[in-house]
A protein has these predicted regions:
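Intrinsically disordered, low-complexity, charged/polar segments
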Residues: 1-11, 15, 86-128
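Short beta-strand-centered aromatic/proline hotspots
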Residues: 63-71
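Short, charged beta-turn/beta-strand-edge "cap" motif at the junction between a beta-strand
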Residues: 57-64, 84
Length: 128
């Protein structure tokens, strides 16, 4: 079976992301871990989850840390407590941030996530 060749043109790359099924967007919601977390867990990246503490690395809210309030799978965006703006009527509105522009600082660990981390570490150890 041959591997599907991805197009080189940026427009076709973006189209492929937008047209992909929503269940495959979870892979696109990965972001890198802080250096201390990388050493602790032996992983470079993990999928962002509600409740995680993240640091914004690029954009308008650069160098701000905040808790993840919501993860939007359809638009591949993350909403943070600290990334807000004031609307014309005075209400606070959250600004969406792309996962490639944030870094995980503290993880929201539950049993399911611990299992995922353990499975990934075992797989990387076996491949080496």
């Amino acid at each position: 079976m041959t591997k599907k060749i991805s197009p080189k043109s940026p427009g076709k790359q973006r189209k492929r992301i937008y047209k992909s099924p929503i269940h495959s967007h979870k892979k696109m919601l990965k972001c890198r871990l802080d250096e201390f977390l990388q050493e602790e867990y032996g992983l470079r990246s993990l999928v962002v989850k509600k409740g995680d503490l993240v640091r914004v690395m690029r954009g308008q809210f650069r160098d701000t840390e905040g808790k993840v309030v919501r993860v939007d799978y359809s638009t591949i965006r993350v909403y943070l407590e600290s990334a807000t703006t004031t609307k014309a009527d005075g209400k606070e509105a959250q600004i969406p941030v792309h996962p490639s522009n944030i870094m995980l600082v503290k993880l929201e660990l539950d049993d399911d996530r611990k299992r995922i981390i353990d499975n990934k570490v075992v797989k990387t150890a076996e491949s080496e």
